[in-house]
Curated annotation (Swiss-Prot):
PANTHER family with a match to the protein in the record: NAD(P)H-QUINONE OXIDOREDUCTASE CHAIN 4, CHLOROPLASTIC, NADH-UBIQUINONE OXIDOREDUCTASE CHAIN 4
Entry GO MF terms: NADH dehydrogenase (ubiquinone) activity; ubiquinone binding
Highest taxon, organism lineage: Eukaryota
Source organism phylogeny: Eukaryota, Viridiplantae, Streptophyta, Embryophyta, Tracheophyta
InterPro entries referenced in this protein's UniProt entry, alphabetically: NADH_Q_OxRdtase_chain4, NADH_Q_OxRdtase_chainM/4, NADH_UbQ_OxRdtase, ND/Mrp_TM
Enzyme Commission no: 7.1.1.-
Known catalytic reactions: a plastoquinone + NADH + (n+1) H(+)(in) = a plastoquinol + NAD(+) + n H(+)(out); a plastoquinone + NADPH + (n+1) H(+)(in) = a plastoquinol + NADP(+) + n H(+)(out)
Similarity comment: Belongs to the complex I subunit 4 family.
Keyword Ribosomal protein in annotation: no
GO cellular component term of the entry, any: chloroplast thylakoid membrane
Membrane topology label: Multi-pass membrane protein
Protein name (database record): NAD(P)H-quinone oxidoreductase chain 4, chloroplastic
UniProt xrefs under NCBIfam families: NDH_I_M
An annotated GO BP: ATP synthesis coupled electron transport
């Protein structure tokens, strides 16, 4: 047990401070915006301080654990803790949410409620990553969906209600499978039902039952990740949402699905995961090719970036399915890497729209001269997305490739085939990313229009772009900073498998 409830404070502070904002007298939009940014910065500083002084990187066990009896009747505990798997995602959540709050400055309609929803989402996401109790994990998982739905339905494009409804139908529907899995896995094979993840990790199940549990959790996490064919909510949602919301979706929400796959499917159900891992590899490979092939056909700029997210998530699925030390480490690194890259691309797409008021690529062209700073940052981050050496994505994808090669589970011909198809996907990636830049910034469509000029990136946008670019380059140059956080936990998870 931890002496000081750091994690409880970290989870509860954003939503508590956000609730306070709703009840205080309205002092104007500017006050609400700066209040939210200050809360996010303070939360990030508290989190960083707590982890620096309490987290030991060479310890694969749960650290900073907190265990409080909550509801006696259900034997329900408020049980929090972190390890190498969750620390990176929690810090990523804090960083991206802070930048998203800064990106939300143009929001003026109901800005107080908008910023409250961002802070409520912040608490739900950190709660999901730090939960050590299955029912608490489910509650935090659902808590995070409510503000996302409201952010999607109240702020965005003309079809925002349609996209928000589609999002909630997919995610709430998949949550039924998550709840059934949580209740089933906690009630099975014990005189005293337990929801403690540490105890459940040592539990064994009949093969058929373990497979059923695995499929239930897989459906829930496949929607959030997303894994094809359960991905169709994502392009519509990104296409209509405000770009600060898109930053939170691409940077954090998608990573919750991948985190759940490792935390529950892989750690609690190793035998079933071993059986399903070849199918994950196949689906991940198809996903890379499918999304990379579909993306060039998207006229909507944000939808094209959304399909690139689906493609990049394929590498994470393959890394999880490889059941190797490099593969799983590469998947975790890709979770962090794409969190930064995806959020950055959506921010730049949104800030471009604020200036030219166009979202369809075939209507753009010739803006590079008018907005050179946005053009430069968009080009650099497009290079990061296509895994240019020196950027975080390159290292992550390279380690995933190495994980496939070193896997002892698969035959040589299977590994060659998977790598070959993945390589085709990597060839297609520059095609849709570079054509996107060409359609946006090159040509003569807008440059020849008389009396038409655009303001380039201001200090706020430039600061935000550079802030998100620095960790992408930093991880690309020194990936061990992220890998060292999770390496011992990865070894601990893989110790339950016969190969790795």
């Amino acid at each position: 047990m931890n002496d000081f409830p750091w994690l409880t404070i970290i989870v509860g502070f954003p939503i508590s401070a956000g609730s306070l904002m709703l009840f205080l007298p309205h002092k104007g939009n500017k006050v609400n915006k700066w209040y939210t940014i200050c809360i996010c910065i303070l939360e990030l500083l508290i989190t960083t301080y707590a982890f620096c002084y309490n987290f030991k990187m060479d310890d694969p066990l749960i650290q900073m654990s907190e265990d409080y009896k909550w509801i006696n009747f259900f034997d329900f505990y408020w049980r929090l803790g972190i390890d190498g798997l969750s620390i990176g995602t929690i810090l990523l959540t804090g960083f991206i949410t802070t930048l998203a709050a800064l990106a939300a400055f143009p929001v003026t309609r109901d800005s107080r409620f908008f910023h409250f929803l961002m802070l409520a989402m912040y608490s739900g996401q950190i709660g999901s990553f730090s939960s050590r109790d299955l029912l608490l994990f489910f509650i935090m998982w659902e808590l995070e969906l409510i503000p996302v739905y409201l952010l999607l339905s109240m702020w965005g494009g003309k079809k925002r209600l349609y996209s928000a409804t589609k999002f909630i139908l997919y995610t709430a529907g998949s949550s039924i499978f998550l709840l059934i899995g949580v209740l089933g896995i906690s009630l099975y094979g014990s005189n005293e039902p337990t929801l403690n993840l540490e105890l459940l990790a040592n539990q064994s199940y009949p093969v058929t039952l373990e497979i059923l549990f695995y499929i239930g959790f897989l459906i829930a996490f496949a929607v959030k990740s997303p894994i094809i064919p359960l991905h169709t909510w994502l392009p519509d949602t990104h296409g209509e949402a405000h770009y600060s919301t898109c930053m939170l979706l691409a940077g954090i929400l998608l990573k919750m699905g991948a985190y759940g796959l490792v935390r529950i499917n892989m750690e609690l159900l190793p035998h079933a995961h071993s059986m399903f891992s070849p199918w994950l590899m196949v689906v991940g490979t198809i996903q890379i090719i499918y999304a990379a092939s579909t993306s060039p056909g998207q006229r909507n700029l944000k939808k094209r970036i959304a399909y690139s997210s689906v493609s990049h998530m394929g590498f994470i699925i393959i890394g999880i399915g490889s059941i190797t030390d490099p593969g799983l480490n590469g998947a975790i690194l890709q979770i962090i890497s794409h969190g930064f890259i995806g959020a950055a691309l959506f921010f730049l797409a949104g800030t471009s729209y604020d200036r030219i008021r166009l979202i369809y690529l075939d209507e753009m062209g010739g803006t590079a001269i008018s907005i050179p700073k946005i053009f430069t940052m968009f080009t650099i981050l497009s290079m990061a997305s296509l895994a240019l050496p020196g950027m975080s994505g390159f290292v992550a994808e390279l380690i995933v490739f190495f994980g496939i090669i070193t896997s002892q589970k698969y035959f040589l011909i299977s590994k060659i085939l998977i790598i070959f198809v993945m390589a085709i996907g990597m060839i297609l990636t520059p095609i849709y990313l570079l054509s996107m830049s060409r359609q946006m910034f090159y040509g003569y469509k807008l440059i020849n229009v008389k009396n038409l000029s655009f303001f380039d990136s201001g200090p706020r946008e430039l600061f935000l772009s550079i802030s998100i670019l620095l960790p992408i380059i930093g991880i690309g140059i020194y990936p061990d900073f992220v890998l060292s956080l999770a390496s011992d936990k990865v070894e601990s998870i893989l110790s339950n498998y016969f190969y790795g």
